UniProtKB/Swiss-Prot annotation:
Pfam families hit by this protein: GcvP2_C, GDC-P
Subunit (UniProt): The glycine cleavage system is composed of four proteins: P, T, L and H.
N6-(pyridoxal phosphate)lysine modification, residue list: 709
Record-annotated membrane-spanning stretches: none
Chemical reaction(s) catalysed: N(6)-[(R)-lipoyl]-L-lysyl-[glycine-cleavage complex H protein] + glycine + H(+) = N(6)-[(R)-S(8)-aminomethyldihydrolipoyl]-L-lysyl-[glycine-cleavage complex H protein] + CO2
GO cellular component, one term: cytosol
Required co-factors: pyridoxal 5'-phosphate
Protein name, per record: Glycine dehydrogenase (decarboxylating)
Protein's organism: Shewanella loihica (strain ATCC BAA-1088 / PV-4)
Family, similarity comment: Belongs to the GcvP family.
Gene3D superfamilies according to UniProt: Aspartate Aminotransferase, domain 1, Type I PLP-dependent aspartate aminotransferase-like (Major domain)
InterPro entries cross-referenced by the UniProt entry: GcvP (IPR003437), GDC-P_C (IPR049316), GDC-P_N (IPR049315), GDC_P (IPR020581), PyrdxlP-dep_Trfase (IPR015424), PyrdxlP-dep_Trfase_major (IPR015421), PyrdxlP-dep_Trfase_small (IPR015422)
Organismal lineage: Bacteria, Pseudomonadati, Pseudomonadota, Gammaproteobacteria, Alteromonadales
PANTHER family, per the entry: GLYCINE DEHYDROGENASE (DECARBOXYLATING) (PTHR11773:SF13), GLYCINE DEHYDROGENASE, DECARBOXYLATING (PTHR11773)
GO BP term, pick one: glycine decarboxylation via glycine cleavage system
Length: 962
């Protein structure tokens, strides 16, 4: 009989062993190799004593996966999922099961990274290109981005673009029609305040009365009215104003496109194309503009180029606009967007096709027609006389109607002026309309849905004016017209998935990206309807489960970070930076020090830091780093003193972007505080802090947390993300507010930074599960294992490559940088060559040329096993041997496995391959491990220059499919 106790047999800590890659025997072998007795010994060697936490986290003990699911189920059950007719940018939708199972719930799609290595990302690049094509077709404009965070932040980006491209250079007014969604107005006002723009909100027709650089309109508007803006847009453009339009994606299937009315920019949420409401997100925003504004477009763009064989290949285009290159001069700070959700929306369009989408749109419109006709027949006053899906109206006894709605588990839109609204959706049925009649009119109204439908068919409907009915064809490309059976759709999705390398194939060791395990159990609650089908503006007593989950998660994160409060609204890391800087800005203003507008940023900082500071209206002063990669304290002190009167803050990452725990971090905080500034500690590297130290204990005032890095939300191929901010008590009154949902914690004048009050709320259960399952023991062990894995890889590779920076005791933190510049000088082999050659070995390349050009930054995370680390090390050592052959002249510098990487099936089938100085086996099966688990890149190295010089960001011409 076993002598283990029942507690031991219950295995409450089993998930810790599931999450952490190396088992205890492997851990000891690795510790022996790096020269440490234990994980605690290694921790003490690496983490400066002055900042060690010295206590257990107050997040509870680890628990089993079934126990964790049972716990979160209690929260889900407290959410009351009413039928929602609120609309306002969030609608019921049906996620096709083939997409839910094969994309949304498939690690081949949700664990991939942003496609910076396009040769191993052709599948999701095609899906995103489809999203761009969909966006362009529906809006009637030329060039679309790969997705933005949500409709409201897209509106803020549209305003910024308008200012950049408007020829009305002296104008400083941006006009917003007063029937734009209130959350959008809120977010735009927040951004405008930072830029110093004047916002005027008024009736759309009054826009021509102002000298503007841009204007924003909603199509269809908050009340459901459809307006032909053609003449107004022309009048505004005559005055050199840039016209931007927030549009409903489903309505555009049926309505005249804003582009054909003359709009310059069109954006909106793609949520109702098969993505659940999720209490606010995540959802992809589309953003489309004219070709002449392409250099000013925010976010990523997928473009068509060619590979070295001249074959069509996809890549991210015009990256010189983006924050990781242009920093404070970038068009936007956006980095992570909403790629997974954009892919879902594009697959939704592919699966239904233009005819299927038209049927869905027509059904939604017919239900709105029936509802409106019934109300009019009973003498109800309608607010709008045109509509696609939304009918607004007034009733004599609004309170009684609202009471009947709640009793029937129905949510109507209730405006402050007493107007009620009903927005039909894909999920709405004829039975729902009958119930709505009962709610609005009371019993005994005598209306019959079928009879009204027959009358509409017989007599027609003028709710969409004839001149606003879409006449042009949409989605004519073969991709949108051939995958309408589930068999074909399933195979199309799988065919694209097979082109991409994600975590379900091999380690992705991207430094500063923390590509750790996204456990299946953590992901499961995201699919539950109790979380997915909640409208973000529903009465708060219906979202009690969300409220309690968010409160508990906030308390855990407060304890982990050492801060006093959390704000969950930012829906990306870059959005979190912006929100944190706004809190600092408002704090200074509250003290009569609004002139403090200088942000110090070390030269090693992430590109989002200066881009976010610029968005927040700050002036950037760069501080130097010393030869060891640390912040140069003398330079910092000198510059802090120089700008002391205007010093707002410093943005600093910890551990540093160079992968070490800087000994002077607390001193950095003290210097800034002495000069009246605040400390923004970038949370990108929190995976080396959790349970060992914390931003609050170090001395920082505010941080964002990348929940899609440290806290297990998957990267989704480029989003979704979540970037909540933690703040000290003095900054808590200045975090983001919301125009629609009041939390009661922040000041009334705090603007929103995202469309929804809790950002992408439906993915917060992933982080809740991560912390719940690991507990305080597992969180600390995970951080320690991240350190061990990084130091193991560093020491193994240091015999073959120079390691650029180390900290105390020649250790690194959770990532290391290898310096390829000496090898490049000696052999001509570039960091790009090595990155592409790793594709042949079945690996995604580490982070390339950041934070130092000519380097690779490697972050293995705690989730990778010793076997996988050894396979990666074997690949890197083998590549070093290949470089040696180039150095020795055995292989020509312009014809070797590195220069020609990656290799495809077409290469080894090519009869001319024999002219190469290396074998086919060397090209594609360089090690036994590769033979056992081969990943095939589907294109050769892509020509970036060709792609930017011949910009094409739409699906291939139809002739390519013949």
């Amino acid at each position: 009989m076993t002598t283990e106790t029942l507690t031991q047999l219950e295995q409450h800590e089993l998930f810790i062993r599931r999450h952490i890659g190396p088992d205890s025997a492997d851990q000891q072998e690795m510790l022996n190799f790096v020269g440490a007795e234990s994980l605690e010994d290694l921790t003490q060697q690496i983490v400066p004593e002055s900042i060690r936490l010295g206590r257990d986290l107050a997040v509870g003990s680890a628990c089993g996966e079934a126990e964790g699911l049972a716990s979160i189920r209690k929260y889900a059950d407290k959410n009351k999922v009413f039928k929602s007719y609120i609309g306002m940018g969030y609608y019921g939708t049906i996620v096709p099961s083939v997409i839910q199972r094969n994309v949304f719930e498939n690690p081949g799609w949700y664990t991939a990274y942003t496609p910076y290595q396009p040769e191993i990302a052709q599948g999701r690049l095609e899906a995103i290109l489809n999203f761009q094509q969909l966006s362009m077709d529906l809006t009637g404009l030329d060039l679309a981005s790969a997705s933005l965070l949500d409709e409201a932040t897209a509106a803020a980006e549209a305003m910024a673009l308008a200012k950049r491209v408007s020829k009305a250079k002296k104008a400083n007014i941006f006009f917003i029609a007063d029937d734009v969604f209130p959350q959008t107005i809120d977010v735009v006002k927040t951004r405008a305040e930072c830029f110093g723009f004047e916002i005027v909100v008024g009736p759309a027709s009054e826009a021509v009365n102002y000298e503007l650089f841009g204007a924003l309109f909603q199509y269809t508007n908050h009340y459901g009215q459809i307006t032909d803006f053609t003449e107004l847009f022309a009048a505004l453009q005559e005055k050199k104003a840039v016209v931007t339009v927030a549009a409903d994606i489903m309505s555009l299937v049926s309505l005249k496109s804003p582009g054909s009315m003359g709009a310059d920019v069109v954006f909106g949420s793609a949520q109702r194309f098969g993505v659940p409401m999720g209490f606010g997100g995540p959802h992809a925003a589309f953003f489309v503009t004219r070709d002449q504004h392409k250099r000013s477009l925010p976010g990523r763009i997928i473009g068509v180029s060619q590979d070295t064989r001249g074959n069509r290949a996809l890549r991210m285009a015009m990256q010189t606009r983006e924050q990781h290159i242009r920093r404070e001069k970038a068009n936007s700070n956006i980095c992570t967007a909403q790629v997974l959700l954009a892919n879902m929306a594009s697959f939704y369009a592919v699966f239904h096709g233009p005819q299927g989408l038209k049927i869905i749109a027509d059904r939604i419109h017919r239900l709105a027609d029936i509802f409106a006709a019934g109300l009019k027949a009973k003498g109800v006053e309608l607010v709008n006389n045109t509509w696609f899906d939304t009918v607004s109206f007034k009733v004599a006894d609004s309170a009684a109607a609202q009471a009947r709605a709640i009793a029937g588990e129905v949510n109507l839109r209730i405006d402050s002026d007493g107007i009620l609204g009903v927005a039909m959706a894909e999920t709405t049925t004829r039975e729902d309309v009958a119930q709505l009649f009962d709610i609005v009119l009371g019993e005994g109204h005598g209306l019959d849905v079928a009879a009204i439908d027959a009358d509409i068919i017989a007599n027609g409907s003028n709710s969409i004016p004839a001149e606003l009915v879409r006449q042009d064809a949409i989605l004519e490309h073969p991709t949108f017209n051939r995958y309408h059976s589930e068999t074909e759709m399933m195979r199309y999705i799988k065919r694209l998935e097979n082109k991409d390398l994600a975590l379900n194939h091999s380690m992705i060791s991207l430094g500063s990206c923390t590509m750790k395990l996204n456990a299946a159990t953590e992901m499961m609650p995201v699919s539950w309807p109790e979380f997915g089908n909640m409208h973000p503006f529903c009465p708060q007593d219906q979202a009690q489960g969300y409220a309690e989950l968010i409160e508990e998660l906030s308390n855990w994160l407060v304890d982990i970070t050492g801060y006093d409060a959390m704000c969950m609204q930012p829906n990306s890391g870059a959005s979190g930076e912006y929100a944190g800087l706004l809190a600092i800005k408002k704090y200074h203003e509250s003290r009569g020090e609004g002139h403090r507008n200088v942000c110090l940023i070390p030269q090693s900082a992430h590109g989002t830091n200066p881009a976010s500071a610029q968005l927040a209206g700050m002036k950037i002063v760069v501080t130097a780093c010393d030869k060891q990669g640390n912040v140069d304290m003398e330079d910092l002190k000198a510059k802090a003193a120089e700008v002391a009167e205007n010093l707002s803050c410093i943005m600093v990452t910890y551990p540093s972007t160079h992968g070490v725990y800087e000994e002077t971090i607390s001193e950095i905080c003290e210097v800034i505080h002495q000069h009246g500034g605040q400390v923004y500690l970038d949370g990108a590297n929190m995976n080396a802090q959790v349970g060992l130290t914390s931003p609050g204990s170090i001395g920082a005032d505010v941080s964002h947390l990348n929940l899609h890095k440290t806290f297990a939300i998957p990267h989704g191929g480029g989003g979704p993300g979540m970037g909540p901010i933690g703040v000290k008590a003095h900054l808590a009154p200045f975090v983001a507010g919301h125009a629609v949902v009041k939390h009661g914690r922040e000041s009334d004048n705090n603007g929103a930074v995202s469309a929804a009050p809790y950002g992408s709320a439906s993915i917060l259960p992933i982080t809740w599960m991560y912390i719940k399952l690991l507990g305080y023991q597992g969180l600390r062990q995970s951080t320690q294992m991240a350190l061990l894995n990084a130091n193991y890889v560093m020491k193994k590779l240091s015999a073959h490559y120079p390691v650029l920076y180390t900290g105390r005791n020649d250790r690194v933190a959770h990532e290391c940088i290898i310096d390829l510049r000496p090898l490049k000088e000696a052999s001509g082999v570039t960091e790009m060559d090595i990155a592409k050659r790793l594709n042949d070995y079945g690996f995604h390349a580490p982070t390339m040329s950041f934070p130092v050009a000519g380097t690779l930054m490697i972050e293995p995370t705690e989730s990778e096993s010793k076997a996988e680390l050894d396979r990666f090390i074997e690949a890197m050592v083998a590549i070093r041997g290949e470089i040696a052959k180039v150095e020795a002249g055995e292989w020509p510098a312009d014809n070797n496995p590195l220069h020609n990487a990656p290799h495809t099936m077409a290469d080894i089938m090519d009869s001319e391959f024999d002219s190469r100085p290396y074998s086919r086996e060397t090209a594609v099966f360089p090690t036994a491990a590769v033979k056992a688990n081969k990943f095939w890149p589907t294109v050769n190295r892509i020509d970036d220059v060709y792609g930017d010089r011949n910009l094409m960001c739409s699906c291939a011409p139809i002739d390519d499919y013949k």
